[in-house]
């Protein structure tokens, strides 16, 4: 089961943006490669149409953490597998604003999808200020009323409620 495994309440703020989840992506992909850096090692596993092609492999030692998922949608299931880099990039940016401090990277490895230097299209988002950074982003193309963003935060761990306003 792949649902709701965000720490620090992240699942509650990303609920409308996370899509169908890795279980569905895995089942509908001709190939999925997962790399997880945790517990001091790099762990990898590959899948074909939702079925592991080998057991989880324990790789090299690392002090890093993070997860990389690559997938190839099955052309036998989908009429089109052409994705818009701009749409996905916007979605990743929105998720990064909502999950303060989370790093989200997107790289387009399709032939012909390159920048002016001939490199694959790639973006990396991390917003340490969360929704305050989102308001700053919105203000970057508009006139602002105040020099600094007015922001309030409150949390009641017992009631399992948190509030962020900017």
Where are these regions (language model features)?
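Generic, well-ordered alpha-helical scaffold segments in large soluble proteins
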Residues: 27-31, 91, 95, 137
